[in-house]
Amino acid sequence: MKVGVLKDIKVGEYRVIATPAEVSMLVGDGNEVYVQKGAGEGSGFPDEAYVKEGAKLVDTKEEIYATCDFVAKVKEFEPCEYKLLRENQIVFTCIHPAAHPEEVQALLDSKCIAFTAEDSHRYGSPNCEAAGKAGALFGLESLLSINGGMQEYRAAMFFVPT
């Protein structure tokens, strides 16, 4: 199967759907993996790391969509991507269907096979555990005196002027 790893284009999104180690496993299983140039940079994975694991680098998202049977990315599709989806192409990404009806309609119109990343793990799994721990750490960080400390916290929580 031809698997495509897209560079996310949503503003503020720096994650990548597959690490070089995961690409290595896909290639080892006999898949051809295409990675869009720069897909892993925001997560600390240079293009060379993907090539070392057997991926083929491509310049554009259009090449990924046109070439690959399976396309994956982290965040929901942007409107500029809707026209690139193909019938029977398998896509895996966050979709959040209730919040993005126009995206759902584009997926239906394209006749692709879509899987939602946000619903692909069991709630309470390590993924959620990690998110919970990170949330607690960010909360603690906000209470540090260099970030305003407890006074800022009280003001935010109880609307008490400082």
What are these regions (language model features)?
Residues 2, 79-162:
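Glycine/serine-rich phosphate-binding loop and adjoining beta1-alpha1 elements at the start
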Residues 2-106:
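An N-terminal-biased, well-structured beta-alpha scaffold segment characteristic
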